[in-house]
Structures are given as C-alpha cells and as structure tokens.
Amino acid sequence: MALDKDQFIEDLKGASITDLNDLVKAIEDEFGVSAAAPVAAAGAAGGAAEAKTSFNVELTSGGSAKIKVIKAVREITGAGLKDAKDMVDNAPSVIKEDVSEDEANELKAKLEEAGATVEVK
C-alpha cells in the first residue's frame, strides 16, 4: 500500500494534540531520534536566516568635523551638548537602538553627511 502524502497530512490535521504527541514519541522510539534536537537546530538556522527587523545605529568614529557630528547626534537623540559630545568622543557608541531598517539607514546617511563613520548592526 502506497502512502499518499496529501491524505496523511489531512489525517494529521484531524488528529488531536494527544494523538500527535503519541505519534512523535512512536517515531522517536522507532527511529532512535529525538524531536528536540532537529527542532533546536532548525530554530537556530532559521533565526540566522530570518530578516532582521530591529537595528542599532553605532557611531564608530566622529571624523574630522566633530562639531557637525555632535550637532547631528544631538538632533537624532535629543541629548544635551555634553552627552552628545561624550558619545562622539567615546566612539564607538550606540546612537540609536531598536529602530527599523529604513530609519537606521536614514540616520546613518545623516551622520555620514556630517562626517561620521557609522555602522548599522
């Protein structure tokens, strides 16, 4: 008897959670495998392949036009003059955390236009 994949999937859809759990345990016993290991490996690989949705904008160097960069940092962060100067002087420093890719690229362009070296991570 040939196993029809589509019919098998339909049967699985109709099964209860308890039945599916018993099926997984039976497969583990029959083939000597663990469902936990492949799931963890697939999860780790899938996590790396997923598109990143949250980015950090990191100032790696203030460049030679520090005053322009400090002004840009103040505008982006809303920080005071001393805090913005400290961020530029103590580079590398994270200027903005957990922003969208578009916003991160806009901020990077603005900082680079002022003369800074920036990385989006």
Swiss-Prot record:
Keyword line: Ribonucleoprotein, Ribosomal protein
GO terms under cellular component: cytosolic large ribosomal subunit
Keyword presence, RNA-binding: no
Keyword Cytoplasm: no
Pfam families: Ribosomal_L12 (PF00542), Ribosomal_L12_N (PF16320)
Coiled coil: none
Molecular function GO terms recorded: mRNA binding; structural constituent of ribosome
Xref: InterPro entries: Ribosomal_bL12 (IPR000206), Ribosomal_bL12_C (IPR013823), Ribosomal_bL12_C/ClpS-like (IPR014719), Ribosomal_bL12_oligo (IPR008932), Ribosomal_bL12_oligo_N_sf (IPR036235)
Residues annotated as signal peptide: none
Gene3D superfamilies: 3.30.1390.10, Single helix bin
Record GO biological process: translation
Family as reported in the entry's similarity comment: Belongs to the bacterial ribosomal protein bL12 family.
HAMAP family named among the record's database cross-references: Ribosomal_bL12
Subunit relationships: Homodimer. Part of the ribosomal stalk of the 50S ribosomal subunit. Forms a multimeric L10(L12)X complex, where L10 forms an elongated spine to which 2 to 4 L12 dimers bind in a sequential fashion. Binds GTP-bound translation factors.
NCBIfam families per record: L12
Role this protein plays: Forms part of the ribosomal stalk which helps the ribosome interact with GTP-bound translation factors. Is thus essential for accurate translation.
Protein name, per record: Large ribosomal subunit protein bL12
Taxonomic source organism: Pediococcus pentosaceus (strain ATCC 25745 / CCUG 21536 / LMG 10740 / 183-1w)
UniProt gene name: rplL
